């Protein structure tokens, strides 16, 4: 959560530097029942503890003033004005272009079959080659557990879940 706060503060400048779309539009966590207001209070407390600035709990009427299409059943919300959105594709391409410009080599169409932790480095074994590196970034999404478990004694399992993002223009 703390890294999320730091990243949010840096995102606007990064979007200008690397030329990708970014908009600080705030975020809302909606509450549909009075009995759940305490959960909003808990989220607010966590946000404040983690340094998220400007968060507040607002009424259902205030939510509908901000977002007229929100259900009449919403009784309250946690509003975080620092929330923002990016185009994930544009961000990814911008980061890859920047990495390439700074000397990163991409090895495409390589299936990682094993990762071996050595003294001070890793061997990343693919079907064609063994790469040696000091750092491995695990960006395998729902398959991240597979790569984690290759090098860690503490095994994990990721159980994929499906969710939705609604984009409003």
Spans of features found by a protein language model:
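Dinucleotide-binding Rossmann-like beta1-alpha1 core, especially the glycine-rich loop
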Residues: 1-66
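A short, glycine/Asx- and small/polar-enriched loop/turn
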Residues: 35-38, 66-74, 116-123, 131
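A generic structural signal for well-ordered coil/turn residues at beta-strand boundaries
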Residues: 24, 74, 120, 127, ...
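Short amphipathic alpha-helical/adjacent loop interface patches that line ligand
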Residues: 4-8, 99, 141-144, 163
